Regions:
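Polyanion-binding surfaces on beta-sheet-dominated domains and ring/shell assemblies
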Residues: 1-228
Length: 228
């Protein structure tokens, strides 16, 4: 980024303004959620746009063996794929530190909030449970991927339906889905705040993220309770 642009962004922040005209604690107003965008390849899916930032999330379900310390609970697994298609900052190859961190932030928001009742994912205690797999794919990174991925993951979970499962054979019929939804007790929403030279901003752009001194993502429940 050219030095003159950097100086301009920092000067605006010092004055309580930003490049796109927002106040420091003002979220982008153009937020949209689209459900069921990939009904043939995922049990649940969604697309989220926050400004020009776009993320697609999909939910797949599989059968697994429960962990020894939680024999009556299912599990979730969250992953994020950051490709050059979304930003020239990303590269093909093994998961980067950024993608691992992104997945962990979303995972913690869901897990620590208590939004999912994992006992309702149990098929046979100690032997067989459902595993919910959430994959997130940023399509365009215009800043604040954390919040966009979190919202996309939640939307995909809300859209998901269990596939047919034969307990006798232990086989899943992915071509036929039940009307049963994933048990969600609440809907945690994540908000990310950046500290830049002593000022705090929400919903940062890519350019603003380059100047961060610290970043904090907080998950809230519907009643305003901080849960993660």
């Amino acid at each position: 980024m050219a030095k003159i642009i950097k100086e301009h962004i920092l000067q605006l922040i010092e004055k309580g303004k930003r490049q796109d005209g927002r106040d420091l604690l003002e979220y982008r107003s153009d937020v949209s959620v689209e459900y069921g965008i990939s009904p043939k390849t995922a049990e649940g899916s969604a697309r989220v746009r926050i400004g020009e930032t776009e993320v697609v999330a999909g939910v797949k379900m599989d059968i697994s063996t429960p962990y020894p310390d939680s024999p009556n609970q299912g599990s979730i697994m969250v992953g994020a794929e950051l490709s050059p298609f979304a930003s020239d900052r990303f590269e093909m190859g093994p998961p980067s530190i950024e993608s691992i961190e992104l997945a962990r932030v979303v995972d913690r928001g869901i897990r620590e909030s208590g939004a999912m009742d994992f006992t309702k994912l149990c098929i046979k205690e100690g032997e067989m449970v459902w595993q919910v797999i959430i994959d997130m794919y940023p399509m365009n990174d215009a800043g604040n991927l954390r919040d966009a991925c979190s919202l996309a993951a939640l939307a995909a979970l809300k859209d998901a339906k269990f596939p047919e499962f034969d307990k006798k054979t232990g086989k899943i019929d992915y071509y036929n889905r039940t009307k049963k939804s994933i048990p969600l007790e609440d809907e945690p929403i994540e908000v990310t705040v950046l500290k830049i030279h002593g000022d705090y901003i929400v919903d940062p752009s890519c350019e603003e993220e380059e100047f961060l001194d610290a970043r904090l993502t907080v998950a809230f429940l519907k009643d305003g309770t901080i849960c993660a």
